[in-house]
C-alpha cells in the first residue's frame, strides 16, 4: 500500500500468498495442496483490496474528508470486493474453464503449489528456485541497492518529432510475457509502436515546445496528458466488445448453475465443477447491495441537500456501483487472463468508471441545481470518487479472483470453497484498510493534503492514480476535460475490433488481434510493456525450436520447464518487492531515507542502464538454457 501511494506501483498478491502459505503449512503434518490453495486464495483477496488507494485518497486531497472513516472505508472495500467475487462466478466457466487465456500468475501459483506438494517434485522446486533467486537478486540490485536501472530508452529526434525505443528490465514481466504467449505479445507491441512510433512523434512535431523543456520531457508530457487517454478509449470500447462476446458463454454458465440448483444429473458428480449456488449468490448479492446502500446513505447524509435528492443519489449511485461493477469485473478478469494481474491496467478501468459516474451525476447536478454552488460541485466530485472506490475494489478483486480460480482449476480445488474463502478474505482485508491508510496519511500526508501544518510537503505520498482520478472528475464537473483523445481511442478501438474480426474469419480463428492488449500497450509505461513483449517472443522462439525436433515428450518437458522458470521469476521479484517495501517503510517511519539500501553512486545513471541491459540479456540466455535442457533429459 505504501509503494502504491508513493510511486503508483502495486504487485499481485496471489504468488507471494502461495509461497508464504506453502512455507507455513510445511510445518504442519499432512498438509495438502488444497489447504495451501485455500490459504493462498483467501490471503490474496485480502491483499488485493489495497488497490482502493487508486481512488479513495482523492477525497482527502480535494479537502472533502479530513481522515478515513473506519466504517465507511471498511464497508465500501468489503462490498466492492464481494461484488468482484460474485460477478466472476458466472465468468469462471467462460474465462477459465472453456478459455485459452493464459492467466500467468494463476499458472505460476499452481506450479508453486504443485512443486511444494510432491516429495518427488525436486526438479520443479529447483526450476522455481533458480528463477526466484535470479529475479530476486536483480530486483534487489534495481530497487534495493539501486545500482541497476529498471529500464532504458533510446530517443531519436527528427526535426521536432521525438521517437522512443524503450526497454524495461523486469525479469518478472519477462516471465509473465513467456506465459502470455505470442498473440498477446504482438498486440502489445502494436500498441507500443502506435504510441512511441506514431502518436507521440506526431504530437511533439505539431506542437510548440516550451523554451525551458527538453524534447524528451515534452514527449513524456504528451504521452501522459494525451496519448494515454487514447489508450483509455481503446481499452473502454474493447472491454465493451469483450463483454458482448462473453455474454453467451456467461449466460450458459448461469444456466448450468441453475440446473445444478434444481438437482440435475450434474449436481454432485464433479467436485471441481461446482460453484456457489445461484440461490446463495442472490442472498449474498442482496446483503452486499444493502451494505452499499448503507455506506452511500451515510456519505450523502452529510451533504446539505433535500431528503428526496438524497434518496435519488443513493439509488442512482448504488445502481452505478453494481452495473459498472459487473462490466469492469468482466473486463478486468479478461485483461488479467490475457496479460496477467501485474500488467492489467486497473487505473485505466478506474478512469472509465470515474468518467461514466461523473457524466451521470452531471445530469443530476444540472437538474437539481447542485451545480449552482461551489460546494455542490465539490460534493458531486466527492460522491463520484466514493462510488468509484466501490467499483475499483470490484475490478481489483475480479482481476485477482480469476487468477486464483485458474490456480484452483490446475490443482483440482473446489470452486465454491474458493469463492467462500475469497469473500472471507475481502472482509478480513477490509478491516485493516482504513487503519493502515490512516497511519500512512498521518505519517506522511498526501500531495495537497497534509494533516499537520509543520509537515514537509516533499515527504508527502503522491498517490498518482488518486490524483489523476480526482483531476478527471473535477475536469468533467468544471467542463474542462479534453474529450478528443478518449474519443480518438474509441475510434481506434473500433477499427482494431474490425481487423480482429476479419483475421478470425479469414484464418478460421487461427489468427487474432486482442484489442484490449493493444490498448494496454498504449496506456502502460513502456518499461512495463517491453519485457512482457520480449517474454512472449522468447516463448514463441523456444516453441518453434523445440518443435523442429519432432519429439512430443521433449516439447512437453520444455513447456513445463519454461512455465516453472517463469513462475520462479514472478515469485522472486514479487517476494523481493514485499521485503523491500517493509525495509523502506521501517526506514521512513523512523525518520530515515526512502532508499535506505541505495549505494548512491555518483555519475552512475548511464552505467546503471548498461548494467541493467546486460543483466537482462543474461537473464534471457539463462531462461532459454533452462528450457532447452529438455533436449538433454
Swiss-Prot record:
Protein name: Putative oligopeptide transporter HI_0561
Cited NCBIfam families: OPT family oligopeptide transporter (TIGR00733), OPT_sfam (TIGR00728)
UniProt GO cellular component terms: membrane; plasma membrane
Transmembrane portions of the chain: 8-28, 45-65, 70-90, 128-148, 180-200, 230-250, 281-301, 311-331, 345-365, 379-399, 420-440, 483-503, 515-535, 564-584, 604-624
Entry membrane topology: Multi-pass membrane protein
Primary location recorded for the protein, binned into one broad class: membrane
Location within or outside the cell: Cell membrane
Keywords: Cell membrane, Membrane, Peptide transport, Protein transport, Transmembrane, Transmembrane helix, Transport
GO MF assignments: oligopeptide transmembrane transporter activity
UniProt key word Nucleotide-binding: no
Organism: Haemophilus influenzae (strain ATCC 51907 / DSM 11121 / KW20 / Rd)
Entry annotated with the keyword Transmembrane helix: yes
Similarity-based family: Belongs to the oligopeptide OPT transporter family.
Pfam families registered for this protein in UniProt: OPT
InterPro entries in alphabetical order: Oligopep_transpt, OPT, YSL-like
Amino acid at each position: 500500500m505504501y509503494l502504491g501511494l508513493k510511486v503508483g506501483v502495486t504487485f499481485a498478491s496471489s504468488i507471494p500468498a502461495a509461497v508464504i502459505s506453502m512455507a507455513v503449512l510445511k510445518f504442519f503434518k499432512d498438509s495438502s495442496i488444497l489447504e495451501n490453495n485455500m490459504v493462498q486464495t483467501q490471503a490474496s483477496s485480502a491483499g488485493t483490496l489495497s488497490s482502493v488507494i487508486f481512488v479513495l485518497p482523492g477525497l482527502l486531497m480535494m479537502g472533502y474528508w479530513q481522515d478515513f472513516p473506519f466504517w465507511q472505508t471498511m464497508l465500501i472495500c468489503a462490498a466492492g470486493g464481494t461484488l468482484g467475487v460474485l460477478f466472476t462466478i458466472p465468468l469462471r466457466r467462460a474465462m477459465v474453464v472453456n478459455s485459452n487465456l493464459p492467466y500467468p500468475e494463476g499458472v505460476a501459483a499452481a506450479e508453486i503449489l504443485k512443486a511444494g506438494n510432491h516429495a518427488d517434485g525436486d526438479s520443479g522446486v529447483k526450476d522455481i528456485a533458480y528463477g526466484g533467486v535470479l529475479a530476486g537478486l536483480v530486483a534487489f540490485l534495481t530497487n534495493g541497492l539501486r545500482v541497476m536501472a529498471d529500464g532504458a530508452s533510446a530517443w531519436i529526434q527528427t526535426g521536432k518529432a521525438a521517437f522512443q525505443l524503450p526497454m524495461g528490465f523486469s525479469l518478472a514481466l519477462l516471465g509473465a510475457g513467456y506465459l502470455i504467449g505470442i498473440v498477446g505479445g504482438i498486440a502489445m507491441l502494436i500498441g507500443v509502436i502506435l504510441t512511441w512510433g506514431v502518436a507521440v512523434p506526431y504530437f511533439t512535431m505539431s506542437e510548440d515546445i516550451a523554451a525551458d523543456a527538453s524534447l524528451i520531457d515534452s514527449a513524456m508530457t504528451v504521452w501522459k496528458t494525451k496519448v494515454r487517454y487514447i489508450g483509455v478509449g481503446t481499452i473502454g470500447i474493447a472491454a465493451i466488445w469483450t463483454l458482448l462476446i462473453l455474454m453467451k458463454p456467461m449466460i450458459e454458465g448461469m444456466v448450468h448453475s441453475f440446473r445444478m440448483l434444481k438437482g440435475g444429473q450434474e449436481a454432485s458428480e464433479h467436485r471441481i465443477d461446482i460453484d456457489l449456488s445461484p440461490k446463495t449468490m442472490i442472498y449474498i448479492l442482496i446483503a452486499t447491495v444493502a451494505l452499499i446502500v448503507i455506506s452511500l446513505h451515510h456519505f450523502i447524509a452529510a451533504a446539505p441537500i433535500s431528503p428526496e435528492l438524497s434518496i435519488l443519489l443513493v439509488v442512482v449511485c448504488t445502481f452505478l456501483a453494481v452495473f459498472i461493477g459487473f462490466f469492469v469485473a468482466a473486463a478486468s478478469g479478461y485483461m488479467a487472463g490475457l496479460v496477467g494481474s501485474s500488467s492489467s491496467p486497473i487505473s485505466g478501468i478506474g478512469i472509465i468508471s470515474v468518467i461514466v459516474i461523473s457524466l451521470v451525476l452531471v445530469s443530476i447536478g444540472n437538474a437539481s441545481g447542485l451545480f449552482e454552488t461551489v460546494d455542490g460541485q465539490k460534493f458531486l466530485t466527492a460522491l463520484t470518487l466514493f462510488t468509484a472506490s466501490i467499483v475499483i475494489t470490484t475490478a481489483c478483486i475480479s482481476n485477482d479472483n480469476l487468477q486464483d480460480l485458474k490456480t484452483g482449476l490446475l490443482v483440482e480445488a473446489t470452486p465454491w470453497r474458493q469463492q467462500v474463502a475469497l469473500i472471507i478474505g475481502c472482509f478480513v482485508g477490509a478491516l485493516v484498510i482504513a487503519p493502515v491508510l490512516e497511519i500512512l496519511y498521518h505519517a506522511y500526508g498526501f500531495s495537497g493534503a497534509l494533516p499537520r501544518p509543520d509537515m514537509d510537503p516533499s515527504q508527502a505520498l503522491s498517490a498518482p492514480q488518486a490524483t489523476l482520478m480526482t483531476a478527471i472528475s473535477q475536469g468533467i464537473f468544471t467542463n474542462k476535460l479534453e474529450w478528443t483523445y478518449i474519443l480518438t481511442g474509441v475510434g481506434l478501438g473500433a477499427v482494431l475490433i474490425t481487423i480482429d474480426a476479419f483475421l478470425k474469419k479469414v484464418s478460421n480463428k487461427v489468427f487474432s488481434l486482442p484489442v484490449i492488449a493493444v490498448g494496454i500497450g498504449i496506456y502502460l509505461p513502456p518499461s512495463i510493456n517491453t519485457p512482457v513483449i520480449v517474454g512472449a517472443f522468447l516463448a514463441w522462439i523456444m516453441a518453434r525450436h523445440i518443435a523442429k525436433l519432432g519429439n512430443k515428450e521433449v516439447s512437453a518437458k520444455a513447456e513445463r520447464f519454461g512455465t516453472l522458470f517463469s513462475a520462479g521469476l514472478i515469485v522472486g521479484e514479487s517476494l523481493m518487492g514485499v521485503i523491500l517495501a517493509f525495509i523502506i517503510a521501517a526506514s521512513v517511519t523512523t525518520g530515515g531515507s526512502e532508499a535506505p539500501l541505495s549505494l548512491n553512486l555518483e555519475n552512475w545513471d548511464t552505467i546503471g542502464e548498461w548494467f541493467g541491459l546486460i543483466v537482462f540479456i543474461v537473464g534471457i540466455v539463462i531462461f532459454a538454457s533452462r528450457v532447452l535442457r529438455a533436449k538433454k533429459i
